[in-house]
A protein has these predicted regions:
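A conserved glycine-rich beta-strand in the N-terminal activation segment of trypsin-fold
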Residues: 60-89, 105-109, 202, 260-262, ...
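Active-site-proximal beta-strands of protease catalytic cores
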Residues: 85-88, 142-152, 201-222, 270-276
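N-terminal Lys/Arg-rich, disordered targeting/topogenic segments
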Residues: 1-6
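Hydrophobic membrane-insertion alpha-helices, especially the h-region
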Residues: 12-27
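Conserved active-site neighborhood of the chymotrypsin/trypsin-like protease fold
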Residues: 82-158, 195-196, 244-253, 258
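C-terminal cap/linker of serine protease catalytic domains
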Residues: 9-12, 29-55, 212-281
Length: 281
């Protein structure tokens, strides 16, 4: 259901920020490029192996993922070992039972939490991975770096970007969000990653300290833009869901020279995962 935006009017600083962002975007697109190497290949035979007892999701019931569900997979991430996960709400709007993928073709059923707007919070009670730490609530500055690890086309990949600034009401309506949406200019991605990347939706945007500062809501490949929530939006989503994520894992410093390796580690530890719909509502 599309949310009404009539009660929210963009303040002057947002309008001016959009103008500054456009100028910054043009400047960035002309001079910066930071590519990441291709991720390591999958381990042969891993698809049919049992879930390891050391897996963060080993204590959860596991169900098979149908090919149709796998094709619709998006990215999500852990925010605490208590089994609390975040992703984008749009792709799972009519999903009754989401699933957190534990291994290829297998997922742990998750419980939807109430209060979702642009961000969806789900839980896997009794099983969870070390959380991605959340950045403190603060205003990001134009030009800051962000790194997006995930599963762009059903497989591993990542994007690097620089923050442009808050977007206008028209962009808010596109994402059915009633809070600010941030735009970032892409400056790099995994080698060989081309075209639209629907599977990256729901991924965390990480700052240079490895802390989540937003959730990826969508992209504009032709313009080289990605769109995310704000840091405040993450904590509001948790509060609306009525969950306490528990202790998060340590953040890892990330830069343009190592964001590919950092993303590989987050995926390997199931701190960044695929999220699928196991049963439609």
């Amino acid at each position: 259901m599309r949310l009404s935006l009539s009660a929210w009017r963009p303040p002057d600083w947002l309008v001016y920020g959009a103008i500054v962002a456009a100028a910054l975007a043009g400047s960035l697109s002309r001079r910066e490029r930071a590519m990441a190497p291709e991720p390591p290949p999958p381990v042969p035979g891993a698809a049919g192996m049992p879930i390891s007892p050391d897996s963060p999701l080993a204590a959860s019931p596991i169900t098979s993922v149908t090919p149709a569900a796998a094709r619709g997979a998006q990215t999500g991430f852990s925010v605490g070992e208590a089994g609390v996960w975040m992703t984008a709400a749009a792709g799972l709007g009519r999903c009754r039972t989401p699933g957190v993928v534990a291994a290829e073709g297998r997922a742990a059923p998750a419980v939807r939490r109430p209060g979702a707007d642009a961000v969806l919070v789900v839980t896997t009670p009794g099983a969870g991975a070390p959380g991605v730490p959340l950045a403190a609530m603060h205003d990001l500055q134009a030009g800051e770096l962000g790194f997006v690890p995930g599963f762009p086309k059903g497989g591993p990949g990542e994007v690097a970007a620089r923050l442009l600034g808050p977007q206008t009401r028209r962009v808010l309506a596109r994402f059915e969000a009633n809070e600010p949406v941030l735009a970032w200019a892409e400056i790099g991605h995994t080698e060989g990653l081309k075209g639209a990347r629907p599977g990256l939706v729901g991924a965390p945007v990480l700052d240079r300290a490895g802390r989540a500062v937003g959730v990826l809501l969508g992209e504009s490949p032709r313009r080289g833009r990605i769109y995310t929530t704000t840091p405040d939006g993450l904590r509001r989503a948790l509060a609306a869901a009525g969950v306490t994520p528990g202790a998060a894992g340590a953040g890892q410093p990330i830069g343009t020279d190592n964001y590919g390796r950092a993303a590989d580690g987050l995926r390997r530890d199931l701190r960044v995962v695929q999220v699928v719909c196991l049963r439609a509502g």
